[in-house]
């Protein structure tokens, strides 16, 4: 098998597929509150295009898929997309990232279709604040979604917490306590200068050393734990006596570019080899032309930088506010 390897020796076996750029929320770090223009439906990859693409990609070593958005559960055919991917025997793991507003309703069908596990965005445990950060989200719906995911066996459940200075950094302790009684993995993620967030990221950025300082301040003893299924770049820890774990993902202050094994496919059919690099290849016209398609995929990988620009900003102490041109919801979270 010919593997998808870049010039730095990194083998790519994981792809994140955005199935829509639309979302029912407007999280402050992801999308502006208004003035948005979304892709017309005919510009969005169809279920058959996604499945056909993956039937080819597995022949080159891709074996893990994460479905993202926008909010992927807005797709009326999301269960059929999962079912189509689940029918490809070479795919070992299918996961989804969701805001969980519709997860309680769809978790069972998704599990039956072949979904392996779920990541849930949850940036506050206080209902009013959660509603403010998401501009309309209902915390109880997320909690119901978590419970349903547990019931149907989507495991491990991971909660993604974007740490925002002055908005939710006083909840670190609450999130840590959340792991004591629940077998979940809470992942604290640095605020990144992507798209809409790029205009204000310096003011809202908080280094993740804050997490460990919070543990020390309240006397929580913690230890590193072995890899969690699908843990990716997260460094994981467990508070003594806790059922669950917590992790830190620091793409800004301590990048993990040297071990990056992922590609991204946008909802409109562009391959991106690096989240923070604007270069991308339009592969949609060649979905049914495997030779040409794989040439474009390999070209994107060949052009992949050794490190992303966020790392360079900190190394050079520039920390400019220049964002990428696509919003996170357009790239795929």
UniProtKB/Swiss-Prot annotation:
Pfam families: Mob_synth_C, Radical_SAM. The gene is moaA. Keywords: 4Fe-4S, GTP-binding, Iron, Iron-sulfur, Lyase, Metal-binding, Molybdenum cofactor biosynthesis, Nucleotide-binding, S-adenosyl-L-methionine. Its EC number is 4.1.99.22. Pathway: Cofactor biosynthesis; molybdopterin biosynthesis. This is GTP 3',8-cyclase. Binds 2 [4Fe-4S] clusters. Binds 1 [4Fe-4S] cluster coordinated with 3 cysteines and an exchangeable S-adenosyl-L-methionine and 1 [4Fe-4S] cluster coordinated with 3 cysteines and the GTP-derived substrate. Belongs to the radical SAM superfamily. MoaA family. One of its GO terms (molecular function) is cyclic pyranopterin monophosphate synthase activity. CDD domains: Radical_SAM, Twitch_MoaA.
């Amino acid at each position: 098998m010919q593997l998808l390897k870049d010039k730095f020796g990194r083998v790519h076996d994981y792809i994140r597929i955005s199935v829509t750029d639309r979302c029912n929320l407007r999280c402050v770090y992801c999308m502006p509150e208004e003035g948005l223009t979304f892709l017309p439906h005919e510009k969005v990859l169809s279920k058959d295009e996604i499945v056909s693409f993956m039937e080819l990609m597995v022949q080159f070593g891709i074996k893990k898929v994460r479905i993202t958005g926008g909010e992927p559960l807005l797709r009326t055919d999301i269960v059929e997309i999962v079912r189509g991917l689940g029918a490809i025997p070479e795919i070992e793991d299918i996961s989804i990232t969701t805001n969980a507003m519709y997860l309680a309703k769809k978790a069972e069908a998704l599990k039956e279709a072949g979904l392996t596990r779920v990541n849930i965005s949850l940036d506050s445990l206080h209902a009013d604040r959660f509603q403010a950060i998401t501009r309309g989200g209902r915390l109880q719906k997320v909690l119901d979604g978590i419970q349903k995911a547990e019931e149907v066996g989507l495991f491990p459940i991971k909660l993604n917490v974007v740490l925002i200075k002055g908005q939710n950094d006083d909840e670190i302790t609450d999130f840590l306590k959340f792991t004591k009684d629940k077998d979940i993995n809470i992942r604290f993620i640095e605020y990144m200068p992507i798209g809409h967030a790029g205009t204000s990221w310096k003011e809202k950025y908080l280094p993740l050393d804050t997490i460990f300082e919070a543990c020390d301040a309240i006397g929580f003893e913690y230890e590193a734990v072995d890899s969690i299924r699908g843990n990716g770049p997260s460094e994981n820890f467990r508070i003594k006596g806790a059922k669950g774990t917590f992790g830190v993902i620091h793409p800004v202050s301590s990048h993990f570019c040297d071990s990056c094994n992922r590609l991204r496919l946008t909802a409109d059919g562009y391959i991106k080899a690096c989240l923070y690099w604007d270069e991308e290849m339009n592969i949609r016209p060649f979905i049914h032309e495997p030779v040409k398609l794989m040439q474009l995929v390999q070209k994107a990988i060949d052009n992949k930088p050794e490190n992303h620009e966020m790392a360079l900003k900190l190394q050079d102490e520039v920390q400019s506010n220049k964002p990428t041109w696509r919003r996170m919801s357009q790239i795929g979270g």
